[in-house]
Structures are given as C-alpha cells and as structure tokens.
C-alpha cells in the first residue's frame, strides 16, 4: 500500500542513525517473501492521478530503494516462496539474498500496466544478473526459481526453507 512504502522508506532512513542495529533481515510473514503491491489498492488509484501526483508516488517508491541502498547496516533478504513486484525490488535492493529452491522471483510490473523499469530495476538488476538476463526478466515478467536465481547470481545462497533464517 502507499502507507507501507512510506513506512518502509522512513524505517530505512532512520536506520542511518541506529548505532544499536548491526544488520537488517527482511523475511516474509508466512510461506512467501512478498507478493508485491496490491494491484487494486495501488494500480487503480494511480490511473486517476495527474502527473504531479504520479511523480510524487514514483519518487516515494524510488526513495524506499535509495534508503535501502544507503542504509549503513547490511540488509539480508531471506526469500522463501513468492517474491514478486515490489517484493522483488526490495530483495534486489538488499545487500545479500538468501533463497530456497521453492522461491519464485518475478518482476511483474509490465503485466499490471507499469514500466518494467519501476523502482530502479533497470539500474540494479543488470548489475546483479547481467544485461541480457535482466532484460528477459523485465520484458517478460517471467518468474525464476531458486536454483536458477542462484545460477544467475541473483541469490547468494540457496538454503533449505527451514534454515533460511539460520544461514
């Protein structure tokens, strides 16, 4: 939701001053990492926005990614299950990505009427998996499984689902 983006952005900005926090681990609640933004709650209202308001939303989502990248603590994404849309972006913006074989990561923006380069994907994803592979994922919205994500260099390690937080 819009509020979730703002809350996460603000959290990562505050972490710059949190000397007592040594690392950040992002994990989903339940069987999935993050399925992305609610299409009806986010995409629907975006259609009715005028350019200045749309730019404000784009800046807010971009500011979340920037806040993550400027966070002085290492950010680890512990990915199990679905990791899509904004969830895939948050995993991409993390310093390390630990996944499971059953993970499915997808950049689905073009499938819901948004640009495939949303939230900095065109900048960061090619640096992780290479230009050709990034283009494939961003153009098609195809999901990659955990083993393929490891082969492509997207995941730093593939773990058993029950130990992804332990690793």
Question: Model regions: which residues?
Answer:
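Crotonase-fold acyl-CoA enzyme core
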Residues: 66-167
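Conserved CoA-thioester-binding segment of acyl-CoA-metabolizing enzymes
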Residues: 1-29, 66
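Catalytic-core regions built around general acid/base machinery
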Residues: 11, 60-71
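Loop-to-helix element that buttresses phosphate recognition and phosphoryl-transfer chemistry
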Residues: 32-33
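Hydrophobic alpha-helical membrane-association signature
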Residues: 4-8, 57-60, 90
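Short, flexible, mixed-charge acidic loops at enzyme active sites
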Residues: 36-45
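Terminal peptide-recognition signature
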Residues: 7-8, 26, 38, 74, ...
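A short acidic, glycine-rich active-site loop
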Residues: 46-59
């Amino acid at each position: 939701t819009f509020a979730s983006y703002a809350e996460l952005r603000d959290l990562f900005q505050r972490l710059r001053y949190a000397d007592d926090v040594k690392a950040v681990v992002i994990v989903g609640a339940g069987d999935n990492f993050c399925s992305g933004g609610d299409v009806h709650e986010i995409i629907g209202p975006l259609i009715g926005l005028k350019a200045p308001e749309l730019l404000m939303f784009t800046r807010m989502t971009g500011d979340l990614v920037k806040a993550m990248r400027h966070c002085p603590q290492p950010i680890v994404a512990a990915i199990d299950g679905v990791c899509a849309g904004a969830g895939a972006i948050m995993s991409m913006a993390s310093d390390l990505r630990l996944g499971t074989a059953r993970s499915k990561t997808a950049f689905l923006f073009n499938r819901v009427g948004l640009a495939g380069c949303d939230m900095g994907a065109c900048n960061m994803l090619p640096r992780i998996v290479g230009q050709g592979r990034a283009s494939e994922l961003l153009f098609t919205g195809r999901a990659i499984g955990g083993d393929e994500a490891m082969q492509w260099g997207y995941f730093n390690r593939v773990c058993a689902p029950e130990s992804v937080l332990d690793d």
